[in-house]
Amino acid sequence: MKKKTEKTSVSYDPVVISETTNVQFTKSVKSTGTTIYGKILKDGVEVGQVSYEEAGDYMITSVKPFSKLTKEEVAELYAQVPTCIDEMLHE
């Protein structure tokens, strides 16, 4: 019997942005390509999301409410996320 779709999901250890903030990534691989999704958490509460779609080669980051993160946390988030996505795509 032929499978309709093949899907594999992998969860990663949190990426530390600051003492109170991290990103929890999950990678999903399907026949149509790879999707990477991350929840941005501060003090255990979701304050944003990151998603990357290999099919369209785009990344979307949303932080809401923006005022929940410090300028340093936002800078660190944008400094680390592209490297994390690249590593996940090439493993």
Kindly label every feature range from the protein language model.
Residues 1-91:
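Viral virion structural and adsorption modules
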